């Protein structure tokens, strides 16, 4: 049950189509669904404005398919599955024999079930990544932001090794409501972007780099120690988390954060 379902239920009660007792039962039974291996949070859409997201890593294809089916049966029409590799996606698609299209994007290891919504945010989210090797994380961020109703501008391969590439997009950066800055290696892109814009910057360190990058820890520490004001940092390779936060900011400013 999401916010629209709840509003419809209350409307039905007001119109006499549903009794208060029946409505109460529906609301009381909506919060969770017990699948044995998972307790699905079916009321998250009502509380937070966006339904539960499925984290694919560590789950079997059978578990993912069962979760998707249960969420759809509960009325959640749009479902995001993250960290879903191609082999697991193929098996999950086989198990979804009821016409559910995963909408799989292999570069981002994302599955997007349901139609992409019209943008409802106040402005645009810019997703900027330092190098082509950062694209999987960047696409996870960009597609997640679009999934939650945001207009997204992609600025790819604009790292500090060729600063002119970033400066060529000064206009897009100036018009952004939020910037997601993604970089591995030394992670300098976030600080540079933070010094160019007046909006919030969400930095995403990636695990791209040679030995002393320590799987993204070097970029993480550099971003945490940024001297640029307005830079916040999420975990290594967490494009989803950055995009979700950026979407919240963009929708808060538009007053639509409870209706995504």
Residue locations for each model-derived region?
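Long amphipathic alpha-helical segments
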Residues: 1-85, 89-90, 94-95
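Short glycine/serine/threonine-rich phosphate/pyrophosphate-binding segments
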Residues: 62-64, 134-139, 163-164, 183-192, ...
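Short, acidic/small-residue loops that bind anionic groups at enzyme active sites
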Residues: 101-105, 193-216
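Glycine-rich oxoanion-binding loops at beta->alpha junctions
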Residues: 108-114, 151-172, 217-218, 234
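Glycine-rich phosphate/diphosphate-binding loop of Rossmann-like nucleotide-binding domains
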Residues: 121-164
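C-terminal binding/interaction regions
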Residues: 129, 133, 170-174, 178, ...
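Glycine-rich phosphate-binding loop
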Residues: 168-206
